[in-house]
Curated annotation (Swiss-Prot):
Enzyme class: transferase
Protein name per its UniProtKB record: Phospho-N-acetylmuramoyl-pentapeptide-transferase
Molecular function GO terms recorded: metal ion binding; phospho-N-acetylmuramoyl-pentapeptide-transferase activity; UDP-N-acetylmuramoyl-L-alanyl-D-glutamyl-meso-2,6-diaminopimelyl-D-alanyl-D-alanine:undecaprenyl-phosphate transferase activity
Subcellular location: Cell inner membrane
Catalytic activity: UDP-N-acetyl-alpha-D-muramoyl-L-alanyl-gamma-D-glutamyl-meso-2,6-diaminopimeloyl-D-alanyl-D-alanine + di-trans,octa-cis-undecaprenyl phosphate = di-trans,octa-cis-undecaprenyl diphospho-N-acetyl-alpha-D-muramoyl-L-alanyl-D-glutamyl-meso-2,6-diaminopimeloyl-D-alanyl-D-alanine + UMP
Lineage, top ranks: Bacteria, Pseudomonadati, Pseudomonadota, Alphaproteobacteria, Hyphomicrobiales
Superkingdom as given in the UniProt entry: Bacteria
PANTHER family in the record: PHOSPHO-N-ACETYLMURAMOYL-PENTAPEPTIDE-TRANSFERASE, PHOSPHO-N-ACETYLMURAMOYL-PENTAPEPTIDE-TRANSFERASE HOMOLOG
Family according to the record: Belongs to the glycosyltransferase 4 family. MraY subfamily.
Cofactor dependency: Mg(2+)
Keywords from the named record: Cell cycle, Cell division, Cell inner membrane, Cell membrane, Cell shape, Cell wall biogenesis/degradation, Magnesium, Membrane, Metal-binding, Peptidoglycan synthesis, Transferase, Transmembrane, Transmembrane helix
Gene Ontology BP annotations: cell division; cell wall organization; peptidoglycan biosynthetic process; regulation of cell shape
Keyword hit for Cell wall biogenesis/degradation: yes
Function of the protein: Catalyzes the initial step of the lipid cycle reactions in the biosynthesis of the cell wall peptidoglycan: transfers peptidoglycan precursor phospho-MurNAc-pentapeptide from UDP-MurNAc-pentapeptide onto the lipid carrier undecaprenyl phosphate, yielding undecaprenyl-pyrophosphoryl-MurNAc-pentapeptide, known as lipid I.
Length: 361
């Protein structure tokens, strides 16, 4: 919205800064973090009052969780989502289709997560929204988003998969790209959801991934930088850097309250929304495969669950002491803070590897 002030630069020369994505990204970070700082305590108090017993804690999980996490309210994703939306509406170019597509996915996945959290809290059970129904709705939302991005993009590129390390290698999937793109978005949403099991564990890697994709969006949406780095230029995606900035700001504000011992949990409301958002930005910028590197921690968490389930069904034995894998390390004797900080370090390393693919071609 504030981007339109740049049109008044002849009268107010200082307003020219609103043209620049970098300036507006910084504004989005500051706006989102201040919003969450200001309204976070009130949201937490309201959720604690409404939820009573808070998020149900897994009885088969680490016993320390039953003591330290019991009674903590969930749906903290509402704080992140609110800060993200306010900052994006203020600082992004609202005539940009990609902005609205990403917000559509974020809102849709957030609503699914909210309903799932609501069922878990009211029933005081981990049996929330039906898994099949949830995946079906997520796939529908993601599919619509991918179709919109294909129609908005450049023919021959928007329906293609780009490969890191190869500057000219494109695999055009045609309309099958809708299935591929929807899978990326849904997988990202649920992978982040599985990662959100310890205080601060998910939000920091999400911010790291957002910072990485903020740079990727800016570079991919700038014809000069895209040509220099020999990555695929996608007109308009640079504006998604503003949304990435809003994620970082809202995430920093949320982490203030989610740092151990957490005053609030993100819940599916936040984790599904943020994962879907990252997935949709990856699809928009043509960096779907790079997402698997930058978000490798989320992939690891998701794969650990898949391996555990398949192994138990086929052999009756578990590969890990507990899945997702962060609980496995807790069972091995790592403290919660050790797991969280070490996983943060992994997220940083993977993000650097992912960003390196922009230059190594």
């Amino acid at each position: 919205m504030l981007q339109w002030l740049a049109q008044l630069h002849d009268t107010f020369p200082a307003f020219n800064v609103f043209r620049y994505i970098t300036f507006r990204t910084g504004g989005a970070i500051v706006t989102a973090v201040l919003f969450v700082f200001l309204f976070g305590p009130g949201i937490i108090s309201t959720l604690r009052l409404k939820q009573g017993k808070g998020q149900p804690i897994r009885a088969d999980g680490p016993q320390s969780h039953l003591l330290t996490k019991k009674g903590t309210p969930t749906m903290g994703g509402l704080m992140i989502f609110s800060g993200l939306i306010v900052a994006t509406l203020l600082w992004a170019n609202l005539s940009n289709l990609y902005v609205w597509v990403v917000l559509f996915v974020t809102t849709g996945f957030g609503l699914i997560g909210f309903y799932d959290d609501y069922l878990k809290v009211t029933r005081q059970s981990h049996a929330g929204f039906s898994g099949k129904a949830r995946l079906a709705i997520e796939a529908l939302i993601a599919g619509i988003a991918v179709v919109l991005m294909i129609n908005a993009g450049r023919a021959g590129l928007s329906s293609s998969v780009a490969f890191p390390f190869f500057k000219d290698l494109l695999l055009d999937l045609g309309w099958f790209f809708v299935v591929f793109g929807a899978f990326v978005i849904v997988a990202a949403g649920n992978a982040v959801n599985l990662t959100d099991g310890l205080d601060g564990l998910a939000i920091v890697p999400v911010m790291i991934a957002a910072a990485s994709f903020g740079m990727i969006s800016y570079l991919s949406g700038n014809v000069v930088f895209a040509d220099y780095l020999q990555i695929h230029y996608v007109a308009g995606v640079g504006e998604l850097a503003v949304i990435c900035g809003a994620i970082i700001g809202a995430g920093l504000g949320f982490l203030w309250f989610n740092a151990p011992p957490a005053q609030i949990f993100m819940g599916d409301t936040g984790s599904l929304a943020l994962g879907g958002l990252l997935g949709s930005i990856a699809v928009a910028t043509k960096h779907e495969i790079v997402l698997a590197v930058i978000g490798g921690l989320f992939v690891l968490e998701a794969v650990s669950v898949i391996v555990q389930v398949i192994s138990f069904r086929l052999t009756g034995k578990r590969v890990f002491r507990m899945a997702p894998i962060h609980h496995h390390f807790e069972q091995l004797g790592w403290t919660e803070s050790q797991v969280v900080i070490r996983f943060w370090i992994i997220a940083v390393v993977l993000a650097l590897l992912g960003l390196a693919t922009l230059k190594l071609r």
